[in-house]
């Protein structure tokens, strides 16, 4: 548990190569996920500014859980500001809709019904998605979309909303997807 307190303040960039079956143009995707921003997390905004300035990537993928509470909206705007001039796409996580609820860690070790699910979002997810969409990013929450990436070409994408809160709906690939026999 002690290391967890330290490690959460030491963000890192990890690199993975994903093999593909057919020759396709090389594309580098920067994934931003699980920021859980709230006042006091400014170090994450600074880390992301450094990433934007020093890393080479073609497209940004935001995969949700950006808010650590209702008071994190300004930090979310600041965190994404250096990336919004790049091509991007996004899906949402539960902590884009609902603020986190403290949980007993022991609950993960036993069968538990857990807290009652909430149905009314209390986080400013619409403002965040509007910011990203206004920058030309593609919303893939239960949708498909095409994204033109300079130097790479068009990416045909498919996404779902958060499965943990039962908002996911799988959609058929867009006609732009090549289908093989």
Residue ranges and their predicted role:
Residues 29-31, 61-63, 89, 157-159:
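Structural motif
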Residues 150-181:
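Catalytic-adjacent loop/helix segments of enzymes that bind and process anionic phosphate/sulfate esters
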Residues 8, 35-40, 65-69, 116-118, ...:
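Short, flexible loop segments at the rims of nucleotide/cofactor-binding pockets, characterized by
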Residues 20, 43-148:
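Core catalytic region of metal-dependent phosphoesterases/phosphodiesterases
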Residues 17-30, 137-138, 145-157, 179:
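Beta-strand-turn-beta hairpins that frame and shape the catalytic cleft
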Residues 1-23:
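N-terminal membrane-anchoring alpha-helices
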Residues 12-15, 42, 137-140, 166-169:
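Short gly/ser/thr-rich secondary-structure transition/capping motifs
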Residues 22-49:
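Short extracytoplasmic
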């Amino acid at each position: 548990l002690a290391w967890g307190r330290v490690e959460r303040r030491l963000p890192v960039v990890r690199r993975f190569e994903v093999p593909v079956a057919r020759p396709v143009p090389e594309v580098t995707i920067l994934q931003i996920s699980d920021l859980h921003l709230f006042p006091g997390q400014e170090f994450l905004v600074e880390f992301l500014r450094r990433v934007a300035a020093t890393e080479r990537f073609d497209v940004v993928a935001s995969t949700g859980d950006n808010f650590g509470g209702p008071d994190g909206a300004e930090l979310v705007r600041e965190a994404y500001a250096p990336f919004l001039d790049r091509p991007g796409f996004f899906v949402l996580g539960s902590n884009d809709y609902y603020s986190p609820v403290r949980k007993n860690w022991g609950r993960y070790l036993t069968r538990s019904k857990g807290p009652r699910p909430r149905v009314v979002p209390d986080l400013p997810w619409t403002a965040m998605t509007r910011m990203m969409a206004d920058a030309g990013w593609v919303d893939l929450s239960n949708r498909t979309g095409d994204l033109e990436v300079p130097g790479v070409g068009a990416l045909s994408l498919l996404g779902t909303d958060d499965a943990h809160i039962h908002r996911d709906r799988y959609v058929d690939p867009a006609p732009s997807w090549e289908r093989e026999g």
